[in-house]
A protein has these predicted regions:
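ABC ATPase NBD coupling module
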Residues: 56, 72-89, 107, 115, ...
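Conserved ABC transporter NBD signature motif
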Residues: 60-71
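Conserved ABC ATPase signature
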Residues: 146-151, 155
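A short, proline-enriched helix->beta-strand linker immediately N-terminal to the Walker B motif
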Residues: 166-170, 199
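Helical segment within the ABC ATPase nucleotide-binding domain
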Residues: 187-199
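A short, surface-exposed alpha-helical micro-motif characterized by mixed small hydrophobic
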Residues: 212-214
Length: 259
């Protein structure tokens, strides 16, 4: 059975039914990664939010999203809450908006763990320190006792990765996870994701073709809510078929992040 199957996904907003995603289809198995590239407004992030069940109430969603054969479209919110952070997780673009500025890091990571793993295995605090260390954070106890503003951008992004992976989800959605980082830190975070996502199904959303090339073999190009081209990323870079893909490649800085 395919782990994630998206078929003819359509997302429309408001009374005028403005189309954000139009007929998107793809499949992912465990260990597979699909990069989705396109400019702002192309429907990349909306696709992720539809999978995660976090679209606003005025969104009209149709088609099919199946996780291990279970239909997610129309799933009651109480059931979706049990999936988020446990079977499906997301690494967001901007840590300072994803993290609570008034709460220490250890508590934030710990709450994600406690929601789904209360009473299981080692104490929550031990799991928090283990994951902070695993994502490459130096001095995990100190960082766990810190507030988000006391950390660097790279440290905050690593915290988000720890939060997304701590419950060992089968599907990870990465929404522009390195956009706010400088090139050196970006490379370090991409190397970390390459390692940690190896056994999971994952979507990697970005406007940056060079970044997607570093972590994905397959890529889908989105424009105006539709997938206009899909295939092996190196083949698409060498011989793009769609005019929009050609423009993206012409604008890309493919030498900044080497595979």
């Amino acid at each position: 059975m395919t782990y994630l199957e998206v078929r003819d996904l359509q997302v429309r907003f408001g009374r005028r039914q403005a189309v954000a995603v139009d007929g998107v289809s793809f499949c992912l198995d465990k260990g597979e990664r699909l990069g989705i590239i396109g400019e702002s407004g192309s429907g990349k992030s909306v696709t992720c939010m539809a999978i995660l069940g976090l679209l606003p109430e005025h969104a009209h969603v149709s088609g099919s999203i199946r996780l291990e054969g279970r239909e997610l479209i129309g799933l009651p919110e109480r059931h979706y809450r049990a999936l988020r952070g446990n079977e499906i997780s997301m690494i967001f673009q901007e840590p300072m908006t994803a993290l609570d500025p008034t709460m220490r890091i250890g508590r934030q990571v710990g709450e994600v763990v406690a929601i789904h793993r209360a009473g299981e295995g080692p104490a929550t605090h031990e799991i928090v320190l283990e994951w902070l260390e695993r994502v490459g954070i130096q001095e995990p106890p100190r960082v766990a006792n810190s507030y988000p503003h006391e950390l660097s951008g790279g440290q905050r992004q690593r915290v988000l990765i720890a939060m997304a992976l701590a419950n060992r989800p089968g599907l990870v959605l990465c929404d522009e996870p390195t956009t706010a980082l400088d090139v050196l830190v970006q490379r370090q975070v991409l190397d970390l994701l390459n390692s940690e996502l190896a056994e999971r199904a994952s979507l990697f959303v970005s406007h940056d073709l060079a970044v997607v090339r570093h972590v994905c073999r397959q890529v889908a190009v989105m424009k105006d809510g539709q997938i206009v081209e899909r295939g092996l990323i190196d083949e698409i870079i060498d011989a793009p078929q769609h005019s929009y893909t050609k423009k993206l490649i012409a604008a890309a800085r493919l030498d900044e992040v080497q595979p």
